[in-house]
Regions:
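N-terminal mature ectodomain segment of secretory-pathway/periplasmic proteins
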Residues: 30, 34-107, 140
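Flexible, processing/modification-adjacent segments and terminal tails
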Residues: 41, 100-166, 190-194, 247-253
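Short, surface-exposed beta-strand/loop "edge" segments at domain boundaries and coil↔beta transitions
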Residues: 71-76, 88-94, 105-110, 159-164, ...
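Short, hydrophobic/aromatic-rich segments at coil-to-beta transitions
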Residues: 59-65, 78-84, 145-153, 179-181, ...
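C-terminal motif of bacterial Sec signal peptides marking the signal peptidase cleavage site
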Residues: 12-15
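Gly/Pro-enriched, hydrophobic low-complexity segments
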Residues: 150-251
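Bacterial signal peptide processing site
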Residues: 17-19
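Sec-dependent signal peptide recognition
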Residues: 2-7
Length: 253
């Protein structure tokens, strides 16, 4: 009798555990479905992110660093704290405010608030176009050397960033889904929406720990229809890329 009671208890316990596992499994599946549904970007842009290593790999990364000329630009990808180091000056964002430190006053030419994350955005394409507070709109393709490149316009909701009226348009290869062009407006000074787009060609890419990041970009001139024609200036080259899942101390920024 005692053995029978113990057996019944054991069966009950095992049954409860199995039910708990099923319930846990259902919750995990529901969570996975919920996470998929959270994505706000269009399916085509999801393919662009995938062509560049995948949005999940990007989100796991903690630190991104690269060189532009004599500047070393380092970013905490989760907080978006940034440091731009040069032999004669440093500037950045510590999570609260933009700062500038110079060996000699006037060494840095430009506006720190405008410049501190400018090249981070150009370099972190296309992944920064998955940030929160973004609206997407399919736009007409642009044409260059016989190829039409489909595009999506990216605009920001009010009070997102220092220039919420800035707009971006990403153009991608229709076959490989690799990003090819970026059109963007600048509203930092005017604080008003603009339809004047600058155009950048992403010439070369490289694999950095599984993520496909830019190695060289070139600003282009456009015709009246908005299609690229010829380079407007020499190429900008990025070197010594690093992306890591290890965080840097807050004091670094």
């Amino acid at each position: 009798m005692k053995k029978l009671i113990l057996l019944l208890i054991a069966i009950t316990v095992i049954s409860c555990k199995n039910e708990a596992k099923k319930e846990s499994s259902k919750k995990e599946e529901a969570q996975e479905i919920k996470e998929v549904k959270k994505e706000k970007f269009p399916e085509e842009l999801g393919k662009v992110f995938q062509a560049h290593g995948g949005i999940n790999a990007w989100r796991k990364a903690q630190v991104l660093s690269f060189n532009k000329g004599e500047e070393v630009i380092t970013t905490d990808l989760q907080s978006r704290k940034i440091v731009v180091n040069h032999s004669k000056y440093s500037l950045g964002f510590d999570g609260k405010e933009v700062w500038l430190s110079e060996d000699e006053k006037g060494t840095f030419k430009g506006n720190p608030e405008f410049y501190y994350n400018l090249y981070f955005y150009f370099y972190a394409m296309p992944f920064v176009l998955s940030d929160d507070g973004i609206a997407y709109e399919k736009v007409d393709a642009i044409s260059f050397e016989g190829t039409d490149f489909p595009g999506y316009k990216i605009s920001y909701k009010a009070n997102v960033g220092t220039s919420p009226d800035d707009n971006y348009i990403i153009y991608y290869n229709p076959t490989s889904y690799q990003m090819e062009w970026l059109a963007y407006t600048v509203t930092f000074n005017s604080k008003e929406p603009s339809e004047k787009y600058n155009l950048i060609k992403y010439n070369k890419w490289e694999n950095v720990n599984g993520l496909i990041l830019p190695q060289e970009i070139t600003w282009f001139k456009k015709d009246d229809a908005g299609n690229p024609t010829e380079p407007a200036r020499p190429a900008t080259v990025f070197t010594l890329p690093l992306i890591s899942q290890a965080k840097l101390a807050d004091s670094f920024y």
